[in-house]
């Protein structure tokens, strides 16, 4: 189960990173972001595309190096815990309908957080 979870995350983040790199205006618009200038687009590419690429590599390395799988699960717990917490705060402040397309990600992030919790508890080491 751990291998499937890590593989899913690696593929998920690789896909998002490629999408951000190939179509930054489309992806930022999909998220409700609009770069004000080329510097904003550069920042979007670095923060969204670059971070997603780094996460994809991290999860892929954890797949290849079993001794790092528990660390990858702990990262997932922290990552999705923070994302779900802040997205929940945004939903409560603004209304969940105001989250736009992020509502779809929110559901997936909750599932990935719950899976991370279950896997951390069940994985020795």
Describe each model-derived feature in a short phrase.
Residues 1-13:
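Cytosolic juxtamembrane helix and N-cap/initiation of the first transmembrane helix
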Residues 96-108:
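Non-cytosolic membrane-interface motifs at loop->transmembrane helix junctions
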Residues 12-38:
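Hydrophobic transmembrane helix segments
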Residues 111-125:
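Membrane-water interface at the C-terminal end of transmembrane alpha helices
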Residues 40-63, 78-82:
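Core segments of alpha-helical transmembrane spans in multipass integral membrane proteins
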Residues 82-93:
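Transmembrane alpha-helical segments of integral membrane proteins
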Residues 31-41, 66-71, 92-95:
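Short juxtamembrane and helix-loop transition motifs at transmembrane-helix boundaries
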Residues 69-79:
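Membrane-interfacial loop-to-transmembrane alpha-helix junctions, especially the N-terminal start
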């Amino acid at each position: 189960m751990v291998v499937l979870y890590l593989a899913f995350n690696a593929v998920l983040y690789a896909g998002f990173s490629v999408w951000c790199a190939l179509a930054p205006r489309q992806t930022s618009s999909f998220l409700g972001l609009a770069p004000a200038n080329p510097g904003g687009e550069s920042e979007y590419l670095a923060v969204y595309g670059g971070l997603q690429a780094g996460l994809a590599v991290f999860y892929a390395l954890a797949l290849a190096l079993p001794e790092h799988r528990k660390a990858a699960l702990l990262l997932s717990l922290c990552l999705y815990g923070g994302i779900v917490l802040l997205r929940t705060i945004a939903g409560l402040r603004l209304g969940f309908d105001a989250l736009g397309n992020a509502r779809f990600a929110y559901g997936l992030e909750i599932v990935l957080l719950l899976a991370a919790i279950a896997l951390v508890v069940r994985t020795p080491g």
